[in-house]
Amino acid sequence: MEEKLLRLRRLPAPLLAWYDENRRRLPWREQVSPYRTWVSEVMLQQTRVQAVLPYFQRFMEAAPTAAALAELPEETLLRLWQGLGYYSRARNLKRAAQTIMEDFGGRFPDSYDALRTLAGVGDYTAGAILSIAFGQPVPAVDGNVLRVAARITGSRENVLDPKVRAACRELMAAVIPHDRPGDFNQALMDLGAGVCLPGGAPLCGECPACAFCTACQEGTQRLLPVREKKQAKREQQLTVFVLRQDGCVALRRRDDTGLLASLWEYPHADGVLDETAAAAWLAQRGVAVKSWEKTVSAKHEFTHLRWRMAGYILTVEGDGAPDWVWADHDRRQQLAIPSAFQKFTREAEGE
């Protein structure tokens, strides 16, 4: 631990000098508030910065404060989030905003323990908010920081082990500069995202830590950090139906819990159905095929699941299943349909 600490103590000065020259210009950094920092950090979980930018702007226009977010209708919330994925993040944001209004009198919590009571706020997000928005010397340790720290110190410990993450947080707490804690944490984020890249692609020649980085000196960048092998994804095959009738398309709302909870989807069947089986499946649900227009295939990756989808675009007649809604174009624009069905949505809209 002492050797690791000695190396990391050399990091703040060159890292902050590098950050001052290379920092990313991002809207939540140009106008800092606890609320904006929180929303941006939640959006950035599992999502690239460039993908987040337009969503952040729209979200701030629709819900510029915790009070506005607490009152935002769920349908509007999910529509704003459509395409970002991991929709539980959006629901947790609203739940947390309601907690801020009800339990904290509308005042954003400024302590670690209080922040951790908010839905969806973990150790990293709490550290980011406290350091960036409140200037408190609290580390924010995510995958980028774990990678940077493992390479600088030469650690061969498994970074997916919670004990290793906790140890890294302890080390960073010992070296974070009290005069610029937010900049230090954001500099680490930028370094990990743009220079100390995963795999064999780090740009060591551009890194302010290269002179004292163990991995750079020993050529072990490809080996660090050590991670357990990911669990193989379960694969599920689906047949998706884009059913057209009188200018409307059939949609159904998913269950309130579980994967893609409460979002809207096209009717679909488990497995891959040929036209005969598909027509029978539809007939059981009260619709008859008038014309088969097109077949479409797509796939979508979730964290532990892969969907392989075969789809039919077709014109039908009949009422359909009780939980189906026949939505015209204007209504469809108001509903949150997950990006997993993006290819089918383009077909439904004639794009």
Model-derived regions, located:
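Intrinsically disordered, low-complexity, charged terminal extensions of DNA damage-control enzymes
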Residues: 1-25, 30, 193-351
